[in-house]
Amino acid sequence: SGFQFNMSVGYDLDGIKLEKVDRFIEGMKDASAAPIFNECRQWLLDNLDRFDNLTKEDVESISPEICNCATLSTLHGCPPQEIERIASYLLTEKKVHTFIKCNPTLLGYEYARKLMDDMGYDYVAFGDFHFRDDLQYTDAVPMLQRLQKLADKKGLEFGVKITNTFPVDVKQNELPSEEMYMSGKSLYALSMSVAQKLAKDFDGKLRISYSGGADYFNITKIVDAGIWPVTMATTMLKPGGYERLEQIGQLFKAKEAAAFAGVSAEKVEAMVEAAKSDKHHVKAVKPLPSRKVKKPVPLTDCFIAPC
């Protein structure tokens, strides 16, 4: 329990309707006719002697129904009408549970700028273009309400994924482009602020899945607030890598998977306020010591990193 695959689809309806993408979606819903699924299944059956804890019954019980849920990724500047058309198509034609990935720009420029400044990220540069060009909060709420009603009518689940990465300006030649995308601990307060607004305005009834600075120190609070599933990436790019998942998994070892019972706006609000002074999220006043080592690190020499 507590684990599932999730399709990510985008970026426009015409592209999603293409035969190649449609075949991918249908293949995820039911892979029983997919050559690669049957090839892999047969390989397992033919090589059972190579495994200590895998039986014929285990292999035959692997469901071909891999995924029945899609997250809609939208490009910055995608019109709300296009977002709604795609989500409606996924719910009505593809009959999959659907989440829409939202952007931190829903907060408005003034809120985002002040929050970043207050947390020590005043050096992170961004203008108001994306805040004006992206989906506006006043358009998002009625759209999400309509899609929630449609999903209820179809007997499917609907929600949002909070949030996409946040476009900021390249100022120190960090990348050979004009923009780069902020993620990790600095994104957390922005993402949780979006979750707070939606939880409050939907009385906690809108499902929220999460990505944006989740790690060992905050993931239990996120889940306890009713926000899940949780996606992590930045924390695994740090020393320890995928081994960090073992530590995070231990946090949930004694927890039973529970049915969705709503998002607590109060808990989310408390998390936003706490993040503003949390050492794991604010910019350190003094530069932290470098995690880099001077010697070349072979693929298997990761034990020298200060995990």
Which stretches of residues belong to each language-model region?
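Active-site entrance/lid segments in N-terminal catalytic domains of soluble metabolic enzymes
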Residues: 1-156, 164-169
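Catalytic cores of alpha/beta
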Residues: 85-88, 213-232
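Glycine-enriched alpha-helix->loop->beta-strand junction motifs that scaffold or abut catalytic
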Residues: 94-96, 203-204, 224-229
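Conserved, mostly hydrophobic/aromatic
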Residues: 100, 160, 198, 222, ...
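Flexible glycine/acidic-rich beta-alpha junction loops that bind and position SAM and/or redox cofactors
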Residues: 104-117, 161-182, 236-243, 247
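Alpha-helix-loop-beta-strand connector modules within alpha/beta enzyme cores
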Residues: 136-154, 182-205, 254-258
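Glycine-rich beta-to-alpha transition loops that act as phosphate-gripper elements at the mouths
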Residues: 164-166, 205-219
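Ferredoxin-type iron-sulfur electron-transfer modules and their immediate structural context
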Residues: 236-237, 243, 247-248, 252-307
